[in-house]
From Swiss-Prot:
Succinyl-CoA binds at R222, G237, S240, A263, E278, S279, G286, K303, R316, R317, N318, S319. One of its GO terms (molecular function) is magnesium ion binding. It catalyses: (S)-2,3,4,5-tetrahydrodipicolinate + succinyl-CoA + H2O = (S)-2-succinylamino-6-oxoheptanedioate + CoA. Mg(2+) binds at E204. Transmembrane segments: none annotated. The lineage of its organism: Bacteria, Pseudomonadati, Pseudomonadota, Gammaproteobacteria, Vibrionales. One of its GO terms (cellular component) is cytoplasm. It comes from Vibrio cholerae serotype O1 (strain ATCC 39315 / El Tor Inaba N16961). This is 2,3,4,5-tetrahydropyridine-2,6-dicarboxylate N-succinyltransferase. Pfam families: Hexapep_2 (PF14602), THDPS_M (PF14789), THDPS_N (PF14790). Catalyzes the conversion of the cyclic tetrahydrodipicolinate (THDP) into the acyclic N-succinyl-L-2-amino-6-oxopimelate using succinyl-CoA. NCBIfam families: DapD_gpp.
Length: 343
């Protein structure tokens, strides 16, 4: 049978012995049947989607199996994990179903951030309710109900426990830093973000989980959950893209290739290739738009959603009438290559 994914992780457990987060440095997409069959008797895997606790001795055995099946990175990690002080867990996903455990959820998020699957490339239904709300501290992740006691213990021991954030999703770079990217403020890119090679995320840029860029992009605005930005597109400073989580929306908002969402602009419908939304203009799916011909004459008045995915369009607000207009985009967007030299 075809398996979806697997990965060995070091995990953090709370005082109830429940896993609250897991670090998969070498996730494997579409593992071979032979690899799963060799891992199964060691880990006690039977069938379906399982998260299995692994001992140090088992980890050493797993290392040999990974090596025998040409999974060098996983073999090296499993070999080191044989001396780990942290709990270990092996997750095997026979099928791509909604995650049933924290470990499964973390594996799926890391599949995206490792660029093994694209946003919407794996089922994440229910993950928000599955994950724990965690205090991410200088001493690692702490389950929120345990934070106050840990702070007291640290102070009495002469230490200060610093809380960087309280969230269900950690920052991506604590788990993986994909090749060829720059992130000015790492706290603004969540685990589960897909950051394409050549992407720069500036200080005010933000990328949520199950969202991101596919290639070279300059991100100075907000890419909400579920949003995908195509290669060569630019998200201007303070710009906002509506996510599928907002208002229970079902439409997947996306931006095609070589498009520009201007500074402080907003988008609530799928934009095609080589499109421009002028600075300060927020276009939602229901916005009424005047379409113009090449001579500036009105052709029709439509809702923006009717122009979803159409390429080579310029959206602007008429400064005299206040009406939103759409016409052919005559200037292609080109990102400044100098800004991406060090990626």
């Amino acid at each position: 049978m075809a398996y979806f994914a697997l990965g060995l992780a070091t995990a953090t457990k709370n005082r109830d012995g429940k896993i609250i987060e897991a670090f998969f440095p070498t996730p494997i997409l579409a593992p071979s049947d032979a690899l799963v069959a060799a891992l199964a008797p060691i880990a006690g895997y039977q069938e379906g989607n399982q998260a299995l606790d692994i001992t140090a001795a088992q980890s050493a055995q797993l290392a040999a199996v990974f090596a025998a099946h040409q999974q060098a990175a996983s073999a090296a990690f499993a070999d080191k994990a044989a001396n780990a002080k942290q709990p270990l867990v092996l997750v095997i996903l026979a099928s791509d179903d909604k995650p049933q455990s924290v470990a499964e959820g973390y594996l799926k998020l890391q599949l995206i951030s490792h660029r093994l699957v694209k946003p919407h490339g794996t089922v994440l239904d229910g993950i928000f309710g599955l994950l724990h709300n965690i205090a991410w501290t200088n001493e690692g992740p702490i389950d929120l109900p345990e934070l106050a006691e840990r702070q007291i213990e640290a102070r009495l021991a002469g230490r200060v426990l610093t809380v960087d954030c309280v969230d269900k999703f950690p920052k991506m770079v604590d788990y993986v830093v994909p090749a060829g990217i720059r992130i000015a403020d790492t706290s603004r890119v969540r685990l589960g973000a897909h950051v394409g090679e050549g992407t720069t995320v500036m200080h005010e840029g933000f990328i949520n989980f199950n969202a991101g860029t596919t290639g070279v992009s300059m991100v100075e605005g907000r890419i909400s959950a579920g949003v995908v930005v195509g290669n060569g597109s630019d998200i201007g400073g303070g710009a906002s893209i509506m996510g599928t989580l907002s208002g229970g929306g079902k439409v997947v908002v996306s931006i095609g290739e070589n498009s520009l969402l201007g500074a402080n602009a907003g988008l609530g419908f799928p934009l095609g290739d080589r499109c421009t939304v002028e600075s300060g203009l927020y276009v939602t799916a229901g916005t009424k738009v005047r379409t113009l011909d090449k001579d500036g004459n009105q052709v029709d008045i439509v809702k923006a959603r009717d122009l979803a995915g159409v390429s080579d369009l310029l959206f602007r607000r008429n400064s005299l009438t206040g009406q939103i207009e759409c016409l052919a985009n005559k200037s292609a967007v080109e990102l400044n290559s100098e800004l991406h030299k060090n990626n």
